[in-house]
A protein has these predicted regions:
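Conserved donor-binding/catalytic core segment of Leloir-type glycosyltransferases
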Residues: 168-186, 191-195, 203-206, 319
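A short, active-site helix/loop in glycosyltransferases that binds the activated sugar's phosphate group
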Residues: 124-145
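Carbohydrate-associated surface elements
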Residues: 133, 148-154, 160
Length: 336
C-alpha cells in the first residue's frame, strides 16, 4: 500500500463513521434528491468484506426506500460492484450507466473489477455509455446499449464576467489553466516539463491534486489555487489565457469522456489537449499535442497568435449538448 492509498483508506473510514450521512429525512420534499450513505468497508479483496458490505447496503437502502414509500424502483448504477445488490430492492429495471473503465484504475484489482462488471452487465436491462470506447465495449453484449455523452450548462460558462477570480491576484500573465481533479489520469511529468520549458508562462491548477511529480517539484511558475465553488469557475477561467487538458495516454484515458471539455469549449477560449479518443472527435475545435515539444508549440501559438485559433462550435452544436437534452435522452433510453 502506498502513502496515497493509506490516506484514501483513512478518508474512506472517516466517512464511514459519519453516521449523520446514513439518515433519511422524515418528510422529504417532492423531487428532492435524498442521499443514503451506508457503512461500507474498503479492501473488497479480503474474505468476507463483500458479504458484510452487501448486508449493510441492503439494510440501509431498503430502510430508505420504505421510509420514502418507494416500491419497484428503477436502479441506476455507475459502478461495477453494484452487481452484489441487484435484486435486493425489488427494482423494476436495472440500468448500468458506465462512466469509466474501472478495471484500468491504478490500485484496483483488475480481474476482480472485470468479473464484477461482467456480472453487472448480465443482470442489467439497459446499458448506457458516456464515451465511444465504453459504448463499443458494452455493445459486445446482447443488451440494449446506448451512447450518452456528457452535457454542458452553456449559459453558465458563456456568461460575461467583469473581473477575474481573486485567487489569481499576483499570478503573472500569460496563464495556462486547468480545473478539476488532477490525478493519475493527468500527466504530471508533462506539465512539469512544460513549466520548465516555458518559464514565462504561469500554469494554474484549480482543484485537488493527487501526489505526483508536479506537486513534488515545487516549480516557481506552477500555481495551485485549491478547489473553488462551482459557481466561481467562470471567474477563474476569465483570468486564464489558454485552457489545458494534459492527460496521460493510456488504456484508462482511452475510455474517459472529460466533462470539462465541453465546458472549456463553451468559454470560447483556446484549448490545448492530449489526443485522447473523445477529444479527437472534436479536433476541429481543439489544438492537439502529445510530446512536450508539440505542447509548447501549440501553447505558444495560442498565446502569441490568438487570432489564428481553432473554429468555435456553432449554435446547432450547443443546442444538442444541454443537460436538458441529455436528461431527456437518458429518460428515453431508460424507458425504451
Amino acid at each position: 500500500m502506498t502513502l496515497t492509498d493509506f490516506y484514501k483508506a483513512v478518508n474512506k473510514l472517516s466517512k464511514m463513521f459519519n453516521w449523520s450521512g446514513n439518515s433519511i429525512q422524515d418528510e422529504p420534499r417532492r423531487n428532492q434528491v435524498v442521499v443514503c450513505q451506508p457503512l461500507m468497508l474498503p479492501f473488497a479483496k479480503l474474505p468476507g468484506v463483500r458479504r458484510i458490505n452487501k448486508a449493510t447496503v441492503r439494510r440501509s437502502v431498503r430502510h430508505g426506500l420504505a421510509k420514502l414509500g418507494i416500491g419497484s424502483p428503477i436502479l441506476v448504477t455507475t459502478v461495477p460492484n453494484a452487481c452484489d445488490y441487484i435484486g435486493d430492492f425489488g427494482e423494476s429495471k436495472v440500468i448500468y450507466y458506465c462512466v469509466d473503465d474501472f478495471s484500468e484504475w491504478p490500485g484496483l484489482e483488475k480481474m476482480m473489477v472485470k468479473k464484477m462488471e461482467e456480472e453487472l452487465i448480465e443482470k442489467s436491462d439497459r446499458l448506457i455509455a458516456t464515451s465511444h470506447k465504453l459504448f463499443d465495449k458494452l455493445s459486445r453484449s446482447e443488451k440494449p446499449t446506448y451512447l450518452l455523452t456528457h452535457g454542458v450548462d452553456t449559459e453558465f460558462f458563456q456568461q460575461s464576467i467583469a473581473r477575474e477570480h481573486a485567487l489569481l491576484d499576483g499570478i503573472p500573465r500569460p496563464r495556462a489553466g486547468y480545473y478539476g481533479l488532477f490525478d493519475e489520469r493527468s500527466d504530471h511529468d508533462l506539465l512539469a516539463q512544460l513549466a520548465q520549458r516555458m518559464p514565462d508562462v504561469s500554469f494554474v491548477i484549480t482543484g485537488r491534486v493527487e501526489s505526483g511529480a508536479l506537486s513534488r517539484k515545487r516549480l516557481p511558475n506552477v500555481y495551485f489555487t485549491g478547489s473553488v465553488p462551482y459557481t466561481e469557475l467562470p471567474a477563474m477561467v476569465n483570468g486564464w489565457d489558454v485552457l489545458i487538458l494534459p492527460y496521460v495516454i493510456s488504456d484508462l484515458t482511452d475510455a474517459i469522456s472529460p466533462l470539462k471539455l465541453k465546458e472549456y469549449l463553451a468559454t470560447g477560449k483556446s484549448i490545448v489537449s492530449s489526443p485522447i479518443p473523445e477529444v479527437l472527435k472534436m479536433k476541429e475545435y481543439v489544438f492537439l499535442a502529445k510530446t512536450a515539444e508539440e505542447w509548447e508549440k501549440s501553447l505558444r501559438s495560442c498565446l502569441d497568435r490568438p487570432e489564428n485559433g481553432k473554429q468555435k462550435p456553432g449554435a446547432d452544436f450547443w443546442a444538442n449538448e444541454t443537460w436538458e437534452k441529455k436528461a431527456k435522452q437518458f429518460l428515453d433510453d431508460v424507458q425504451d
